[in-house]
Design a protein with these regions (language model features):
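Soluble "head" domains of membrane/secretory-pathway proteins
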Residues: 1-107
Length: 107
């Protein structure tokens, strides 16, 4: 991450050797579409023809993990700082605070 002294909460999206792409607001991993139902709450207020996630393509290097934040328009994640190492993961999320409709323990 860009600030080594800060902790970030991100989703691991892809592993080494996998190709991650976003095309027209759809996530693809190795060419296969992947549904991100957890983003529905964020996307519902977007204007038609507006994308929540800009298009990109990334091949995860050896030993790397590709991570994305849920608030895609402003998230600092692998699109900004590249792949991360597994060793940089320090914990797992246990509780959801946002959006309010989803508050509770992670299932």
């Amino acid at each position: 991450a860009p600030d080594a002294d800060k902790e970030y909460i991100k989703r691991v999206i892809a592993f080494e050797g996998e190709k991650v792409e976003y095309i027209a607001d759809q996530l693809f991993i190795d060419g296969e579409p992947y549904t991100e139902a957890y983003l529905d709450e964020f996307k519902k207020d977007l204007a038609k023809e507006t994308y929540f996630t800009e298009d990109f393509s990334f091949l995860v290097p050896k030993g790397g993990l590709f991570v994305l934040g849920d608030n895609r328009p402003i998230s600092k994640d692998s699109r900004v700082f590249g792949a991360i190492s597994e060793e940089s993961i320090t914990a797992n999320a246990k509780f959801i605070f946002w959006p309010p409709s989803k508050i509770g323990a992670v299932k």
